[in-house]
From Swiss-Prot:
Cited InterPro entries: Cyt_P450, Cyt_P450_CS, Cyt_P450_E_grp-I, Cyt_P450_sf, Cytochrome_P450_fam2
Name of the protein this chain belongs to: Cytochrome P450 2C13, male-specific
Family per similarity comment: Belongs to the cytochrome P450 family.
Cofactors (names): heme
Catalytic activity: an organic molecule + reduced [NADPH--hemoprotein reductase] + O2 = an alcohol + oxidized [NADPH--hemoprotein reductase] + H2O + H(+)
Biological process, per Gene Ontology: organic acid metabolic process; xenobiotic metabolic process
Additional remarks: The G(-) form of this protein is thought to be unexpressed.
Organism field: Rattus norvegicus (Rat)
Annotated Gene Ontology cellular component terms: cytoplasm; endoplasmic reticulum membrane; intracellular membrane-bounded organelle
Amino acid sequence: MDPVVVLLLSLFFLLFLSLWRPSSGRGKLPPGPTPLPIIGNFFQVDMKDIRQSLTNFSKTYGPVYTLYVGSQPTVVLHGYEALKEALVDHGEEFSGRGRLPICEKVAKGQGIAFSHGNVWKATRHFTVKTLRNLGMGKGTIEDKVQEEAKWLVKELKKTNGSPCDPQFIMGCAPGNVICSIILQNRFDYEDKDFLNLIEKVNEAVKIISSPGIQVFNIFPILLDYCPGNHNIYFKNHTWLKSYLLEKIKEHEESLDVSNPRDFIDYFLIERNQENANQWMNYTLEHLAIMVTDLFFAGIETVSSTMRFALLLLMKYPHVTAKVQEEIDHVIGRHRSPCMQDRSHMPYTNAMVHEVQRYIDIGPNGLLHEVTCDTKFRNYFIPKGTAVLTSLTSVLHDSKEFPNPEMFDPGHFLDENGNFKKSDYFIPFSAGKRMCLGESLARMELFLFLTTILQNFKLKSLVDPKDINTTPICSSLSSVPPTFQMRFIPL
């Protein structure tokens, strides 16, 4: 056959496939832009601004629509009503974890974030129970955060008001809180292993949040054959896993079953009990991945939020002035802030909430997956279909938060200046897969930020109006730009 004819027939077949598949292949899936064979909607999504692309699609196809990631459909939920209906009202059906190949390659179905089914339920139950035993939601954890806040102040005072990059210091504070829960002890801010841990977590989050890395998630076959930052991500994970397995071994050698010291001890004790959960994976590798998940969630999320907060507080000095006035009035300068203060500090509480709303730290959270064939609204979503939840569409809803692109603590204040809660405040997602450490993160942000503002004047090296708060990447997590500043003791 003539090569030209073959080429034309091939092109016709591909065109036919692309037009036919959405109508017959999708069945009752929600509507969406027409995908191309093999690559899906890849070229229709701006990888540098996925949030805006999702918003644009919602204007055409509504709050529930379908995008094709490669050849696989992904249902997108846009807006508060769609997310609430799926994650809360149909929580069990939408409680699966979607596939993220670059993360799955290291997690291997283990840990908290990327396990599935009964193993995930057992792992989550153990984690929640153990964190409560270790003081989560109680004064025990608050004491740890307050103590770390004092160390944070000491470390910032060492800068003597000179220009500094706050990235590592802001990572060390929440990092030590997590270490005290998992490994019993905190670390000195100059400890080499500790700094290495913080650095590798920071670097890993930047890598998996970069636009380029999403190509490997869409076409995972490339992971084993192409060079790229994903290899650094794998290397960092290998180091962290080895470090944690070494710590676990030390715990085994010094374990006292009658006196558990930390998260690792509780795991080691339970794995040897006769009535242990049959669905729980009690291997040490599973424990190492669990702890890795806690490090990633507990360090970088809080660290990035605090760095964004510092940028915003310098950019909007009138907000900082109001917060410091409230600190002087309620707390003063001679005692440490505590969580009881929060109810008497509506503006400070509003500021902390507004920082989280404005920066949108996890624009789409982690992918969900339906655990069974699911009827949702007028659509049919087959078991195993990935579900993307646009948290941005809720946190930046213009009806709930007028002028959502403006940083304004007034979004969380009523007409009398009292703190105003909002159901649309879901930076930690919602439903069965929401972040386990939400209460700890909120506590850390309030106590760390109020302690910093109680003790320091924040000084930018550039004019406030020139401060850039745009994330350097935001595919998975919003990462703040690198900057320097001065902490001037008050």
